Amino acid sequence: MPTWGARPASPDRFAVSAEAENKVREQQPHVERIFSVGVSVLPKDCPDNPHIWLQLEGPKENASRAKEYLKGLCSPELQDEIHYPPKLHCIFLGAQGFFLDCLAWSTSAHLVPRAPGSLMISGLTEAFVMAQSRVEELAERLSWDFTPGPSSGASQCTGVLRDFSALLQSPGDAHREALLQLPLAVQEELLSLVQEASSGQGPGALASWEGRSSALLGAQCQGVRAPPSDGRESLDTGSMGPGDCRGARGDTYAVEKEGGKQGGPREMDWGWKELPGEEAWEREVALRPQSVGGGARESAPLKGKALGKEEIALGGGGFCVHREPPGAHGSCHRAAQSRGASLLQRLHNGNASPPRVPSPPPAPEPPWHCGDRGDCGDRGDVGDRGDKQQGMARGRGPQWKRGARGGNLVTGTQRFKEALQDPFTLCLANVPGQPDLRHIVIDGSNVAMVHGLQHYFSSRGIAIAVQYFWDRGHRDITVFVPQWRFSKDAKVRESHFLQKLYSLSLLSLTPSRVMDGKRISSYDDRFMVKLAEETDGIIVSNDQFRDLAEESEKWMAIIRERLLPFTFVGNLFMVPDDPLGRNGPTLDEFLKKPARTQGSSKAQHPSRGFAEHGKQQQGREEEKGSGGIRKTRETERLRRQLLEVFWGQDHKVDFILQREPYCRDINQLSEALLSLNF
């Protein structure tokens, strides 16, 4: 029995309908290729049995995804044909189905491309919804304002273009040009999809694409920044000569492992795996480039210190790697979590288990620009600054020198992942709080997306906000989060914080359900405003709730007077000391419950002191008699007109409109704005 995946696990057996046996056998090679598992249809114990037993052999995660895929294939809970812009059709047909396989790995849904702009999705409910969401995300990114694919005469290309084009080096792909013309936002999402597959143990589809290894190796070589070619830090570079490092330009590589056992399935696992320390670690990988495009050869030797004790020799087309177990270089494993330029982690020719070649795994946004792919040997003019940067970061793992003409671009995704590397523990002290503090209502989705830089749903951000108010003495805290965020979602990070807050009754889930393959969610903003009304609480959100302000005067007052904005500086949660402006109450006053003095309306609403401060009483009685308080639509109209003149001064405009509820004269309001001192 062959060994599937990186680590063998006990077989997983489950039953499906016997009517689906033909489907299973038809899709068996497809499942084995994508999920890197062995699929077996066990013999029936009784011919009349309405079920058949399937057995999966492979790593636990692979088997779990394959099991969900097969269950959805045999008994689909949802099946529908979705539509998307025809421009994206090349994603599902191009690259020999590679991106389609990655999407199947990520969602465990059965995907069948049809006419341009049409995709049939079937599977379990969760898998169907995830696949539909990923396709909708790709369609949405088509309209993002990103620079399109490579253009003629461009002297530099971004890391996204470099990595993406490296995936498309397979000859004879009719959709290659269409893929390269996709917007950068779509290419970035596809690379993120590939990263999800690589962070697990798939897709095994790579092994069936013979031409893909050259492209991926080309991405790896281009991602490695060449050190100064003085021989001080290279690893046996004397035998390199003019070794070729041009996988991204069309060279193909034959990957061989010397001294390995014969037989075994073809496999290519992208995830970085730590092998047991007892194994023999002396391995060799011979990479022999076979030029198909011709041209001058280029060399890009790997940094010796970046690979630990790995000997790299590239001479006469050979590339040998001798390695030590990762236990000797624990920092390499930590560095493998950050995204580098390479998309290939392990290469293997189908004759034995593949050796592990450490190289930086992919990330949604590569941190480097890619300069002209000139001779790697000419890149030795990198200054001392690069050496210092490498030395400072060496403790975190292997660092790669960039080319002298390339830029060093730090991305938001990279910064977010770096912030997640800092440990954080939600620690709510079991001590009494202050009884005079208001109820805190947190907009969980808004807080999580702000901390996740609008790309990830960061559960840590919610936990940090709760920790902040808990430390201030608040004990009445409610976080609202849509219920579907608790299901499997690739955008959610560190969901264990949500579980803990839910167990402490600090988190409430707004209802959501799936009907006909579409997610139906309740409007969580209503829950927040309603709870703030009933508890006289404060809403923590950067949302303006403009759509709810018109529903009632009470809600308008809550949104105007009890909305607390916030921001994050890394993992530091910050709120303003003057939530209603410089002349308004302090944060401590803002968060305290109002003093309930009988007969004093001003005591019931102390925050109105800000609205009453500095009121101009001239003409107020005339305005009251002539028209009364402005309606909401009149206020919004006046606000738009004022912002056309006082652009960017939203806070001042809102203050004047709040202070002058009877005034409808745009000129008087403008004069009042000009007379403000803050």
From Swiss-Prot:
Q: Where is the RNase NYN domain?
A: 437-589
Against InterPro entries, the record matches this protein to: KH_dom_type_1_sf, KH_N4BP1_1st, KH_N4BP1_2nd, RNase_Zc3h12_NYN, UBA_N4BP1_C, ZC3H12/N4BP1_RNase_Reg
> Where are the annotated segments for Disordered?
222-251, 347-407, 595-633
One example of the protein's molecular function in GO is:
RNA endonuclease activity
Keyword tags: Phosphoprotein
Superkingdom, according to UniProt? Answer: Eukaryota
Q: Where is the composition biased (Basic and acidic residues)?
A: 370-388, 610-633
Entry GO CC: cytoplasmic ribonucleoprotein granule; nucleus
**What span is annotated as the signal peptide, if there is one?**
none
Q: Name one Pfam family in it.
A: RNase_Zc3h12a
- Bias class Pro residues marks the residues at 355-367
Q: Which residues carry this modification: Phosphoserine?
A: S10, S359
Keyword Phosphoprotein (UniProt): yes
Q: Does the keyword Phosphoprotein apply?
A: yes
Per its UniProt record, what PANTHER family does this chain match? N4BP1-RELATED, PROTEIN KHNYN
Instruction: Tell me the protein family, please.
Output: Belongs to the N4BP1 family.
Instruction: Kindly provide the name given to this protein in its UniProt entry.
Output: Protein KHNYN
Please give the organism: Homo sapiens (Human)
